Design a protein with these regions (language model features):
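S-adenosylmethionine/decaboxylated-SAM
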Residues: 1-166
Length: 166
């Protein structure tokens, strides 16, 4: 699954690497939601603007995928768009929503549904432009316990969260 699809770069890679797997793609496809911008500003996380990252569409993303029949677009506000997927299990989730509220919602929804050994690739964990990612992880850990998180040395300050095997 991917939360925060934008133009589909990561979706393309996931779809190409795992052609037999269903790929849920969660995005507003209209840029940042005003509710998230309001919370972002109140927490001092970033200077994100409403509509930023809106230069995309479902059709453009699906048109890039090598196996578009395996992709399921869930357009709208997350976590509302996850309704009906409560019984799903996930092996790999790309969490690239940039902002505090959707990242926290993504962790709350996806982490318990990860299979043992499953991973969340968290974009912007160490990114100074979008500090809400780290704040969301800290809030999640306060509520649900410590995560097995490994920071990566990449341009966007990503991290990998691994669900321990039982």
């Amino acid at each position: 699954a991917e939360l925060g699809v934008f133009k589909g770069d990561t979706a393309w890679k996931l779809n190409a690497l795992f052609p037999q797997q269903r790929l849920y793609l969660f995005d507003t496809f209209q840029g940042f939601d005003p509710r998230d911008i309001k919370e972002e500003k109140s927490k001092g996380c970033s200077f994100a603007r409403e509509g930023e990252f809106s230069d995309t569409s479902e059709q453009a993303v699906l048109g890039r995928l090598p196996f578009p029949g395996q992709a399921v677009i869930r357009r709208g506000y997350f976590p509302d768009t996850a309704a009906g997927l409560e019984q799903e299990r996930f092996c790999l989730v790309s969490l690239d929503a940039d902002l505090y509220a959707p990242i926290l919602s993504g962790l709350i929804f996806f982490y318990p549904r990860l299979v043992p050994g499953g991973m969340i690739l968290l974009h912007d964990y160490n990114n100074e432009r979008f500090r809400g990612a780290r704040q969301a992880v800290e809030e999640f850990e306060k509520q649900y316990g410590r995560l097995c998180l490994v920071p990566l040395c990449d341009l966007h300050g990503s991290a990998v969260i691994v669900k321990p095997c039982d």
